Structures are given as structure tokens and as C-alpha cells.
Amino acid sequence: MLATGSPECKGNDMTTRPAPQAGDAAARPAEKRRSSAPGPDSLPARVERESGMAPEQASPYMWMRAAAHASRAQLAERMNLSLRDDRRTEAKRVHYLSMEFLMGRALGNALAALGLHGEFDAAARAAGKQPGDILEVEADAALGNGGLGRLAACFLDSLATLGVPSFGYGLRYRYGMFVQRIHDGQQIEEPDDWLRHGNPWELERPEVRYPVGLAGRVVTDGSGRRWLPAEQLYAGAYDFIVPGHATERVAVLRQWQAYPSQPVDFAAFSRGDFAGAGAPMLAAEVINWVLYPDDSTHAGRELRLKQEYFLVSASVQDIVARHMADYGRLDNLGDKVSIHLNDTLPTLAIPELLRILIDLHGMTWDAAMAQCQKVMSYTNHTLMPEALETWPVSMLEHWLPRHLEIIYQVNDRFLKHLALHFPGDEALVRHVSLIDENGERRVKMAALSIVASHRVNGVSRLHSELMVQTIFADYARVFPDRFCNVTNGVTPRRWLAQANPALSATLDERLGPQWRIHLDQLAQLAPQAADPNLQRAVLAAKRANKERLAQLVRRDLGITIDPASLFDVQIKRIHEYKRQLLNALHVVARYQAIIANPDAPWQPRTVIFAGKAASAYATAKTIIRLIHDIARTVNIDPRVRDRLKVVYLPNYSVSLAENIIPAADLSEQLSTAGTEASGTGNMKFALNGALTIGTWDGANIEMAQAVGAEHFFIFGLHAEQVDEVRRLGYDPRLYYEENAQLKAVLDAIAGGAFSPGDPGRYRGLVDSLLNRDAYMLLADFAAYVSAQQRVDAMFATPEVWADKAIRNIAGMGGFSSDRTIRDYARTIWNVKVQ
């Protein structure tokens, strides 16, 4: 039952009882264990106690909060047991540092992991409540934004499910990134006040508190160099427990909250300077306000630096403190601790760890560097040089003077290594130095991550190959064995079992329920792909999901869409390289073709977009506005009727994705070949039976190889062809002049056909395509339109489409985040999995 009697644990290690042994209840799958709590501990009783109302009268929110608290109590007990078992076995721990964790809602996942969905549903219905209404009122945790954060969330799910001793470390953002509103087709950012009613899942840890310094100076004393910060904050911990599935193991996401060393300047307050009196509190609070603050200003860049350092300082102090409590020494740190950097945003963990080992614990430089390299590993997520993070030396010198000294020393020793092993190669030295001397001197965070880590991985085979051939080619010469590949994955618990219960029921009938933790069992579906009964079941599940999404669109946007139409979906961060604009160009081409030949047998299609643009990214915002202008024109044109609809769903989130992805027929994965590191949305769509139209890029390649390229709609230039076209001199205007359809599309957009009140609105956007086209949309346009024609023809034959949908599902077994974590555990972290 959803009982409330489990203790919420005390102390930094949160341990109050012996670790589970084989055969203990705590070592058995969750579904085999049930509480025998008496009536007063039931969920309705807890609803009544927390709301002061009868369960029948309590609101869905009160039901959600009570269910969350009851679930949290059971998860806290599992946390207690997991941490105690890790200490007993002296297991090596993984610590995953990430600026974002896009967790989504937690209640549905917790109920599934605890095996309590049935009891929750029954209790809610007995009180006259709809379980779905209760689940719906939970806010998405605004701790992330895009693929980087969602990958981190999937990893925590798999770390827990595979029993890997693990902590995630992030910041407790007060307002997330932003809520996206659309006004007159334009993105408007508003604070995401997701914590206004508190977070029923988090456990505050007032006993876990670390000082975090800023600015100041470095002095030399009898024990060496020592940093004397001019400012000091404190980091307080909030724990979010991530349950494993078919196990009682959990992972812990520890989020840091900044507090001032002195909350109020009382002297200023007494003088009547109330703003000055509150300045210390404001300086601390702003650290946690927003994920990825606008960095177009100096103040914004400084805030980002402070956020990154605050995260890593608190996290590394916590890791070292836990290790010292367990072992009392640091010479075995690399044997018991793994710190993984999710991109370069947490890279300051490297000089922070070295500072703690050398300055605070008296370790020699060589010993500290050896431990650091054993501990640290780094995942790269981009192939674009301009996206690699750097920090001005002057900014680090002001805010983190001791860390800059340490970075200089790492670089000095690295360059001496190069002089020894690559004598006379001055070009190599310039390229791989941690300091970029061109213009304003800057520290290259990716370079620091490579030099100070023992492993560096890409996230798809193509990405990892290109990584060592292009942006990190010189580092691969120096460290040929340091680079590896671990292809991304997604958790099937959320992205299939939770998001798509209709399809999951069909899979259970065919395979049994174990596919949730053994996703490779999906391969058993491939020989059944032509089975008419399976095809009917898969198509029926898809239709039910499309009807659900159509209701959401009608409710939120007032637009009626036909569930029988082809749902063509592109949902992801709005960025030029992801090429939502190419999709929009095809929509215009299709619209023009329908107008020109209205009596042709057009396949009805609903094109669905969702995604946020970074607040300072003007071009991405212009693309959003163009899509809305196209939608406004197409959707009201009586000549089009229901043969084409365009929908933009605002404020993209995990919960919205859980509604959209199961309903998609076609998954748009359009990145310019060689630019998308991996992608995970592509995997989620295919797992739910959508077919992919996409470029030969990122994980699309491995997915096509697993499923069979004949079951994909691959189009466009490959990465090597992109490079060759650029090398020969890419002229996008030639494509415009030679393709009448493309010319008509661009002329219509540039001429104001979709913005009659402001005819020049998109002239600059079109000019950028004609004169530069950095992501080669015009080069791929004709192939994309041709691939879309193949989509139409195939969708018109449901049994053929269903066959390919089933084969896509069957081929996704290798794209579980469980497989990904097993690969990390084996090739990078050297930890055991269950």
C-alpha cells in the first residue's frame, strides 16, 4: 500500500539500518514486496491529514502531494539501504556532474518503480478522483532544458535500475530556464515558478553545508599556496531520490542551493539602506534563479561562471568529504570515486579537486594530478568549434585566482610533456595549449577536460570518429588511447512504458513485461512484423495516442486536427543546425503545391513543432515566428481544407513530449550531417513506432543500421560530402536558381506572403540562406522533398507502414540507456552493474 511509515533517513549518509543481503526484502524486486501498513497509513488517510479535508473533497493537487510524500517515504528507506550497502561493500561510486537534469514529472515513475500504480488508481477512483487528473497537476521539475539534461535524467534512471552506486549533482533552479509563451507568433520568456508550492519529492539536508568562495587573493604560507576568498557563499543540499525499476536500488540527485554567509547586512538595514541590506541575500539567490542566463552581457557571463563554479565546488567538497568519512585517506580516491563531466560546463571540477587535494590535504602535485586523472572522465556533446566553452583569463583571474594558477600549472606540465614527446612541433603546442592566445586570452575548457581526464567519449559512432578527426585531432595524436565512443540511449520506463501504455500493453501480450529492463527483447517482434493482428494492435495504439494529442491541441490552441492524418513531428531545441527551417520550407512547398493542384489525391498531413529558442538567439526566434506565420496562413486557407495543418505547441517539456511522441507517425531528424552529436529524440520516436525521415548523422546512422535503412527515409548529403561541397566552395544561390520549387518558396517568404502586414519581415532570413546558408538547407532541399513524397506514398498503404513501424520498434533494443550505462561502467568508470 501507499503507506507513510517508512523512515526518512538522517545524517549525511542517510543510513539507519543494516544493508540488504541476498534474499532480504530490500534486495528483491519492488513488485514482490508489499507493505502491511494499517488503515491510518493509507493514501486516503494521508490525504486527509495533509489537507484537513475528506479524500472526496480534497483537490487533485492535495492527492498528488500526499501520494508524492508517501512514495518519497518508501524511496527514502530504499536510499538508506542503498547507501548503507555501498559503504559495507566499499563499492566504487559514480558522480555525474551536470548543469541540468530534465527530470519531468516524478509521481508516475515512482508508482511504477514501487509497484503501486494499481493501488493508487483504486484509491483515487474510490474517492471519485481520476488518477490521470492527479498525475497531471504535478509540475515538471524545471531543472533542465534540452537533450543534455534529459540524457542526464535517463542516466540516473538506468544507474538506479542497474544498481550502480551513484549520485547526480546539479543546481536547484528556482525558475528553470523559462516558460515559453507565444504572443503574435513570437516567443516570450517568463519565469517558470515551479517551486512556488514547494517540491514534495526533495529532502532538505540542513546538515550538509559547504563554503564556496569567490574572488580574493592567493597567498603563500608554510604549507604552500592558499586562497583567501573575498566573498563566501554556502551550498545547502536538497536530495531527489531516483528509483530503480525491478530493484530496490536508487540513485540520488543532489541539488545545491546557494545561501549568503550573512543573510542581511544589519548595519545597512539600520541606516535605512534596505536594498543594500538585502544585497548579500540577492547575490546568493541569483545563483539559483535561472538555468543558462542570457550571456550576451558581461554580468550574464559572470553569473554563468559563478553557477558553474558553485556547482562543482559544492559537489567536489561533498564527494571528498564522503570519501574521507568512508576511508579516512585520499590515496585511494581514484579507486573508489568516478567523477563524470557531462560536457564542459562542470569542467571547473578539475582545478577544484586539485585545489582541495593540494591546498587543503597537503598532497603533492604529482600525486594529486594522478588521482585527478583516475577520477575524471568527460563526455563531449558537440562538433562545432564555436560551441566549445572558453572563459576569459581575466574573468577567472578575478573570480577564481587560485584555480587559474592551477590551470596554468596543468598547462605548463602538459606543454613540457609535448616538448619531450613531440620536439619542435610548435604548431601542435599552439593548437593544444589550454590557453587560447588569439585575441583575448581564454582558457579552453574542453582542452582542460581532455588533459586532466583518463577517458573522453563521444555519443555516437560518427560523432566519436569525427571528434578525433576534426576538433580534437591534435589531442588524439597526443592521447591516442584516451578517446572512445558510448552511444546515447533513453530509458524505456519513461519513454515507452509510462508515455505509451496502449503500445506497452501490446508488447506485454507479445513479450511479457520484462522488456522494460531487457529492451533487447524487442528484437523478437521483427519476425512478427507482418502479423495482421500485431499490425492492427500497433495501429490501434497509435490512433488512440493521436486522438489524445488532438484533444490536447484543441484544448490548448483551439485548432482541430484530424487523427487520421499523418502526424509529422519535429520537437527539439530551436537551432539553425537542427534545421526546423528546412521543415518549414517543405511546408510552404507543400502548401503551394496543394493550391496549384487542389484536386490531386493529397495525403492529409499535420505538421507539429515544439521547442524553445535560447532567449538571446535572434535567428531561432525568427524561425519560430515564421512557423507561426506559415501556420496562420495555411490553417485558415479554405483551399487547403484538412489536407495540411501546422501546429506549434508552446513550452516544450518532458510531459508534453510524453503526449506528442507516442502520437507521431513521422519523426523529423534533419540536422546537417556532421553536426548532431547523437540525438535521443530520434530513439524515443522510433521506440514508439514512428518512422524517421532524417540525415545520415548522429545516432540516426546506428538506428538505420539496427532497423534496416530500407525502413528509414534517409536523405541529403553525408558528412564527408558536406565537407567536400564546402571545400569546393558552396554557393547556395545556385540551388535557388536551378530549382523552381525552392525559388518559389523562398520568394514567397521573402516577399511577405506569410507576413503581409510586414512584407520585409523575413527578407534577412532568406538573404542569409541565399548568401551563406551555413547549414546547407538549400543543398538538401530537393532530396528532402523527394523523401517526403516517399513518406506520402508509403503512409497510404497502412499494412506496409505498420510493418515498418514494428520493425523500428524491434530495432530499438540497443538504444536503452541501460545499455549506455553498461558501456560507461565497463569502458570508462570501471564499476560493476547488477
Annotate each predicted stretch with a short phrase.
Residues M1-D13:
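Short, Lys/Arg-enriched N-terminal segments with co-localized hydrophobic residues
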Residues K10, T15-Q834:
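A conserved ligand/cofactor-binding region detector
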